[in-house]
Amino acid sequence: VKDGKIHSIGKITGEAKDIIEAKGLTVLPGCIDTQTHFREPGSTDTEDLHSGSRAAIAGGITAVFEMPNTNPPTSTKKEFQKKLDLAKNRMYCNYAFYFGATADNANELADLKNLEGCCGIKLFAGSSTGNLLVAEEKDIETVFKNSSKVVAVHSEDEEILNINKKLIKDGDVHSHPIWRSVECAISSTRR
């Protein structure tokens, strides 16, 4: 490491100039955040790939897996490539992106096996930001059957979410776990 940057990777020779006494402390390597929402493209007023990755590094995160529920969603090879292009030379950490599963692209997911920069398929069984909901059982099964990568699931029962929407209190963040309840997640996962 020179001037705060990795200069080379290889076998370490010699002794360290500085030794840090870490007795009684917890020492971790850089961590991996497997669920980031940097909201690019679409909502760069809140955060983007550049600022989000910079914040990740400041917090000890050296790699991120970014979610596909952006605007437009990262659910086609064209949009996936656009996201890779947006990230190139702008991110401070290692990164990979999830490819968003939809009912429309479920039969094409086997083609992603060697898609560079893709860490997996994201399946939204409950609605979230964007329009990536895959609520029908037959479509969920098709996603799993055809996926050539790990499938990460946003597991919430859409029917319960819709019933619970009346529990949302505008501007009250404390209503979030009431609306998106434990029952909602367990019901979806049991399916």
Per-segment meaning from a language model:
Residues V1-P29:
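Histidine-rich, glycine-flanked metal-binding segment
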Residues L25-R90:
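Metal-associated gating/positioning segment near the N- to mid-region
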Residues D45-S53, A103-N114, R191:
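Short, acidic/polar
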Residues N89, C93-T142:
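Active-site gating/metal-coordination segments in enzymes
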Residues G30-T36, V64-E66, Y95-F99, C119-L123, ...:
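Hydrophobic faces of well-ordered beta-strands that scaffold small-molecule active sites
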Residues G59-I61, D85-Y92, E158-R190:
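Active-site gating loops and adjacent loop-to-helix segments of metal-dependent hydrolytic enzymes
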Residues T34-E47, T70, C93-N105, L132, ...:
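Active-site mouth loops of central-metabolism enzymes
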Residues I121, N131-V153, D157-E159, S181-S188:
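Metal-dependent enolase-superfamily TIM-barrel catalytic cores that perform enediolate-based chemistry
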